[in-house]
Amino acid sequence: KMLEGNHANSKKYNIVCVNCGCNANRLYQEYNKSVIRIEHCDYCGQVVDKYVEFDPVIIFLDALLLKKQALRHILFNSGIQSCWKFTLVLLICETITKLLQKSHVPSSGLHTSKVNWQEPDHVIYSAMEWDLFKYFILSLIELGCFLFGMTVWLLLWKCFVRKDTDLPSATVLLQGLVLSSFGQVFMLPMMLWGLQEHSNVCRILCQIFTFSANVQTTRVLCPVWSFGVSLISVLFGHTLSQMTIQQLSQ
């Protein structure tokens, strides 16, 4: 089924070699329903996309390791048309995480909040509070400012640095950056598994992983950018996002 889906998508989307990033005509040649031949890249000579035969779990694990091959498969060869559902899940997880962290913040200098935010009744009650909607809006603004900063960087590069550079469209770049922010989802299960005492450490680790995934995704989508340019672009986007949130929180 995975092969059939990728074969159908290869007619509609640009296929790239997961090893060198060069364009390819197709992922494989199908002779009949039971006989196929995996295509090799004309530039590097390797298999165009080895992940068409892999289990999704293996692809996910390689994506966790931030391997360029896995990221190219997901971003180019998997035929993802829209990531709005994942964006919504990402925002909801970030909203609940902020709400749980707020519920566990010390209420005074000597005592911590006695609200048991892990109780179902409290979760349902919190859903009707203004804080839930406030944190959702803040999470949306935070993500939007980051994507806006990356878009500005991309447009400035196209206009003033190298106008003839083959860079992706803003839509493709933003979709890839949203997908590469999946590390933020890990914060929620950490909180629910009773790691709220180390929430700050867990959040820092998730932010480091997300930042690294954003940089690696930028390098995959914009191969003409050096590591330094990709690093600065992602840093610019996150800095703009954090500065905006700090101003709104004052």
Region locations from a protein language model:
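N-terminal cysteine/histidine-rich coordination modules
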Residues: 1-74
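Intrinsic disorder
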Residues: 11, 35, 61, 127, ...
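Generic structural hydrophobic/aromatic packing signal, biased to beta-strands
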Residues: 17-20, 41, 92, 149, ...
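Preference for well-ordered, secondary-structure-rich cores of eukaryotic proteins
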Residues: 18-19, 26-27, 31-37, 137, ...
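Short hydrophobic/aromatic-rich motifs at helix boundaries and adjacent loops
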Residues: 39-44, 121-125, 185-190
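Selected alpha-helical membrane-embedding segments in polytopic membrane proteins
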Residues: 45, 52-170, 174
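Hydrophobic alpha-helical transmembrane segments and adjacent short intramembrane/lumenal linkers
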Residues: 151-250
